């Protein structure tokens, strides 16, 4: 309709100009016609825009319903039982998995983490470290082998109970457009305000929260863009402390933060990991040195396993990776 309107106005102006030169019409009549043409096409353009928006909305709704109607890739077994009162011992037994069935990402991975141990996952980008975490969280099911927690195959327990035992702190923390208090409370929705504040203190987040304009009632922007990355990670640690899981999954941030914030994050993580089984995708040397075990993963296989010092002494793949 915009093109039609433009052409009509152009024709009117040309024809009107020709008629005006011959004193058949006045300039005022021509201007009136141009205004009438604009008024005629304006609602038509509005209808066309509304139709385009409606088509976009229908396409979006179709995609949403496709997601809602899709069968979940991982479903609870009919006789699945809750996972409760666990110590936190984790074992991968000859696990093989690929996001595509003919392209394995992990092959024959075997590892054992005793309750309370810290396991650092080390390896080059794309080696399979994140896949180990995804399988432990049961975002996918293994193709061969099994994963157990305290001897129970995680495919035999309910997903809700499994994930309630897992605390996850990732590099990028998603914060909701809500108060700081409720963002931390997301770790355990039934927690009281006092419990939320206590978790924030343990996470070294209380000091900067109290400096905010409304303290714990300060509104957070979508995705937490009004907080620094270090502050977002401290809030994520507070969430995990509040949830009180037996098993932790940590993906250390690679981006730089100021020295004070990094020290606070490290102190909070040490408190969080105390007495819990922890799997850490490690980037910091301090974390690697403090880990009970290092699992060196390359091309989907655990190729070396041991402590930082023992693997350096072996002068294998980890030694070369560390020196590089």
Feature-to-residue mapping (PLM):
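ABC-type nucleotide-binding domain
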Residues: 9, 74-77, 81-324
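Hydrophobic residues in alpha-helical segments
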Residues: 20-21, 68, 312, 322
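Extended non-transmembrane interhelical loops and adjacent amphipathic helices
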Residues: 58-69, 312
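Helix-loop-helix
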Residues: 1-62
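Surface-exposed charge patches
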Residues: 18, 65, 198-201
